[in-house]
Structure formats: structure tokens, C-alpha cells
């Protein structure tokens, strides 16, 4: 290869590397955002699960408070 061809090839590789570094940084930021969103969603699921459990326990009366069926 001639020196100018080598220099052109080196410039192409440097350009590709710079582009890849930018892409990696963009992907890293996306992963960070997704981690935050997942954490937020997990907290929402936990709160909703707790709320649902509390509602279910309040809807069920203890056996001692249940009225007997009408055929008794």
C-alpha cells in the first residue's frame, strides 16, 4: 500500500472509531434511562401490590362476623 492509501485507511478507521464511541455513549445513556424507568416502575408495582393487598383484606370479614346462610 502506498503511504497515501495507508493514511486514508487510518483516517477512515479513526472516523469509524469516533462514531462508535459516540454510539456507545448514546447507548450507555439509554441504558441509564431504562434502569431509572425500571426502578420507578418497580416501585409503582410494589405500591399497587400493597394497595391491592390492603383492599382485599378489608373486603373479607372474619368468620365470626359472617352471617349464617339463609337456610340455617
From Swiss-Prot:
Biased composition (Polar residues): 54-66
Annotated stretches, region: Disordered: 53-72
InterPro entries linked to this entry: SlyX
Alphabetized NCBIfam families for the sequence: PRK02793.1
Family membership noted in the UniProt record: Belongs to the SlyX family.
The protein, known as: Protein SlyX
Organism: Pectobacterium atrosepticum (strain SCRI 1043 / ATCC BAA-672) (Erwinia carotovora subsp. atroseptica)
The organism's taxonomic lineage, starting at the top: Bacteria, Pseudomonadati, Pseudomonadota, Gammaproteobacteria, Enterobacterales
Gene name tied to this protein: slyX
